Amino acid sequence: MTLVRMTTPSRELFDDAYHSGTPPWVIGEPQPVIVELEKTGGIRGPVLDVGCGLGEHTILLTALGYDVLGVDYAPKAVERARANAVAKGVDARFEVADAMDLPVEPGYATVVDSALFHVFGRDAERASYAASLHRAMRPDGVLHLLALSDAGRGFGPSVSAEVIRAAFADGWVVEALDTATYRGIVGPAHAESLGLAMGTVVDEPAWLARIRRR
């Protein structure tokens, strides 16, 4: 089931999620898919981790020696990401930024989007986001996009393969669009519908796209 939003969730909604507890996308570790991407040579710097949340991917890649900036729309997420990095002894960088107006310097060779794209519910929002990414990346840069699939069971907002291809039709080449999994933690919003106890770790159907900037 695809969850269609009338508009992008507000900064306050995301900030409240980080203030009130642990959102379902906060799993206390990097997504296994992103870890594997790095191991197989899919990452080169400089790297932008967009919608970084508590910064697990930024912290991982920084610790491995990459030049990385993690950005999030929610100030509370960035605050908690910085604290997370300090606790792990990693000198990682984070900034508050709007995904529709991403920093364009130094011109990123790799962008990691783990579960951000799928929150945009309208074509116009997705087009604006793709344009922002295009400005932020250098020519021939690569976007790795991990999004919940419409083949899933309603764990969160989801998209189809066609939506991904349409959003990146102009100025991009979709080099790969593979089935994958996205790890999350069942919270009160989904426990009843999924028939699972809160706190259950789930690996949900997802898309992993490799998209090259022209």
What are the roles of these predicted feature ranges?
Residues 100-111:
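A short acidic, Gly/Pro-enriched loop at the edge of an enzyme's catalytic core
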Residues 81-82:
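Conserved SAM-binding loop
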Residues 1-42:
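Conserved class I S-adenosyl-L-methionine
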Residues 88-99:
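Conserved SAM-binding strand-loop segment of SAM-dependent methyltransferases
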Residues 74-76:
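Conserved SAM/SAH-binding beta-strand->alpha-helix loop
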Residues 127-139:
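A short glycine-rich, Lys/Arg-flanked "PGG" loop and its adjoining helix->strand segment in the class I
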Residues 109-124:
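A short SAM/SAH-binding and catalytic strip from SAM-dependent methyltransferases
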Residues 140-147:
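Conserved beta-strand signature within the Rossmann-like core of class I S-adenosyl-L-methionine
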